[in-house]
Amino acid sequence: MKMTGWKKKLCRGHHLWALGCYMLLAVVALRLSLRLKCDVDSLDLESRDFQSQRCRDVLYKNLKLPAKRSINCSGITRGDQEAVVQALLDNLEVKKKRLPFTDTYYLNITRDCERFKAQRKFIQFPLSKEELDFPIAYSMVVHEKIENFERLLRAVYAPQNIYCVHVDVKSPEAFKEAVKAIISCFPNVFMASKLVPVVYASWSRVQADLNCMEDLLQSSVPWKYLLNTCGTDFPIKTNAEMVLALKMLNGKNSMESEIPSEYKKNRWKYRYEVTDRLYLTSKMKDPPPDNLPMFTGNAYFVASRAFVQHVLENPKSQRLIEWVKDTYSPDEHLWATLQRAPWMPGSVPYHPKYHISDMTAIARLVKWQNHEGDVSMGAPYAPCSGIHQRAICIYGAGDLHWILQNHHLLANKFDPRVDDNVLQCLEEYLRHKAIYGTEL
């Protein structure tokens, strides 16, 4: 009897142990299933159920881009002056020591693409069905600073989008090879089929975008809008926010287009010639073709697919393109003028009521030095907290709160060699908002 009782206890002990193990395995399996079930259906920004919240927590833990030092990014994005001052002081100290990632670094790390994408924390799946169903095209024109390019690509990257990269023919071979190495890791990122040497303020800057336009239209990706970027741009909206903004355009384009000043009219009064730089000649130009009134803007656009098709295929557009090739900085009046051309899809009329400033358009947020000042006295924005280059602000941490209050999709200029804190905080802000749908 004693032996039988002992056996019963042992048997009961084994049963409880097995049951405990089974329950433990079930919990582990449940947790694992929650981790593995982070697909498009469970990533609904409007959902507050446990599964979606836990899924986002797991995602953010693995994909967050926190500032690498003790910087209060949440305070900086809110405009907290103590946090801003601390970041500016920190930047003065750190930028003396910080070495940017080199071409060699990217050539080495991209030998293993999966490691590169994981280590650099690229988002490799759509975060919502709305984004999946609304792919965006990018024309990215670059010529230097490989880290700037890689961080910009990471910030705007989504697997459903399509990216054409144009590298200046004059760029160093090491830079070109590093760009090729990075884009080789992504099936939806490619080098433009035709590369040109880009000369400042010349036609070649437009030609780079046109080359990407041709390639992007041949892509099988059914993109809806095209955004163009340069190496000093950075997004200030998440991909989901961009999709929402582009849908609200309802087929319209968004770009600066205003009446030119007398000073800017001189840009197309005489012909310019290009060697290694642009030269003004004494040869006067004929009036624009088709009696088209000229407008001025900047190099950046948010253009519908139909607009892009008409840029490349419409005979009137082609005549204007030929006419502006020997003008000064044609990128700053070609797009602005086409935006007012009645034959262009998504354009607006000539009438002054339709003039669009850079602050009204959503294409690019820029602080011009000659417009900075006291906002209470009527200035459009406060002074730059970074430095100026060609009268344009290279943003500092003190500009970030203002930047995020605007409706633009991207801003210009950023440079980690000038202020990396503002970029790190913007990266942290955008990644948090992309995954959680809320600000820091």
Curated annotation (Swiss-Prot):
State the Pfam families in the record: Branch (PF02485)
GO CC annotation: Golgi membrane
Q: What class of enzyme is it?
A: transferase
Q: Which parts of the chain span the membrane according to its record?
A: 13-30
Entry-listed glycosylation sites:
N108
Which GO BP terms sit in this record? protein glycosylation
Q: Where in the cell is it found?
A: Golgi apparatus membrane
Q: What is the effect of changing R115Q?
A: In strain: River-type
> What keywords sit in the KW lines?
Disulfide bond, Glycoprotein, Glycosyltransferase, Golgi apparatus, Membrane, Signal-anchor, Transferase, Transmembrane, Transmembrane helix
Cysteine pairs forming cystine bridges in this chain are C73-C230, C164-C384, C185-C212, C393-C425
* Membrane side Cytoplasmic: residue ranges: 1-12
Instruction: Please give the catalytic activity noted in the UniProt record.
Output: a 3-O-[beta-D-galactosyl-(1->3)-N-acetyl-alpha-D-galactosaminyl]-L-seryl-[protein] + UDP-N-acetyl-alpha-D-glucosamine = 3-O-{beta-D-galactosyl-(1->3)-[N-acetyl-beta-D-glucosaminyl-(1->6)]-N-acetyl-alpha-D-galactosaminyl}-L-seryl-[protein] + UDP + H(+); a 3-O-[beta-D-galactosyl-(1->3)-N-acetyl-alpha-D-galactosaminyl]-L-threonyl-[protein] + UDP-N-acetyl-alpha-D-glucosamine = a 3-O-{beta-D-galactosyl-(1->3)-[N-acetyl-beta-D-glucosaminyl-(1->6)]-N-acetyl-alpha-D-galactosaminyl}-L-threonyl-[protein] + UDP + H(+); a beta-D-Gal-(1->4)-beta-D-GlcNAc-(1->3)-beta-D-Gal-(1->4)-beta-D-GlcNAc derivative + UDP-N-acetyl-alpha-D-glucosamine = a beta-D-Gal-(1->4)-beta-D-GlcNAc-(1->3)-[beta-D-GlcNAc-(1->6)]-beta-D-Gal-(1->4)-N-acetyl-beta-D-glucosaminyl derivative + UDP + H(+); 3-O-[N-acetyl-beta-D-glucosaminyl-(1->3)-N-acetyl-alpha-D-galactosaminyl]-L-seryl-[protein] + UDP-N-acetyl-alpha-D-glucosamine = 3-O-[N-acetyl-beta-D-glucosaminyl-(1->3)-[N-acetyl-beta-D-glucosaminyl-(1->6)]-N-acetyl-alpha-D-galactosaminyl]-L-seryl-[protein] + UDP + H(+)
Record topological domains on the Lumenal side = 31-440
Q: How does it sit in the membrane?
A: Single-pass type II membrane protein
* Known pathway: Protein modification; protein glycosylation
One term of GO molecular function: N-acetyllactosaminide beta-1,6-N-acetylglucosaminyltransferase activity
Q: What is its EC number?
A: 2.4.1.102, 2.4.1.148, 2.4.1.150
Modification after translation (UniProt): N-glycosylated.
What is stated as this protein's family in its record?
Belongs to the glycosyltransferase 14 family.
Q: Please describe what this protein does.
A: Glycosyltransferase that can synthesize all known mucin beta 6 N-acetylglucosaminides. Mediates core 2 and core 4 O-glycan branching, 2 important steps in mucin-type biosynthesis. Also has I-branching enzyme activity by converting linear into branched poly-N-acetyllactosaminoglycans, leading to introduce the blood group I antigen during embryonic development.
Please give the name of this protein.
Answer: Beta-1,3-galactosyl-O-glycosyl-glycoprotein beta-1,6-N-acetylglucosaminyltransferase 3
Which organism is the protein's source? Bubalus bubalis
Write the lineage as a comma-separated list. Answer: Eukaryota, Metazoa, Chordata, Craniata, Vertebrata
The encoding gene: GCNT3
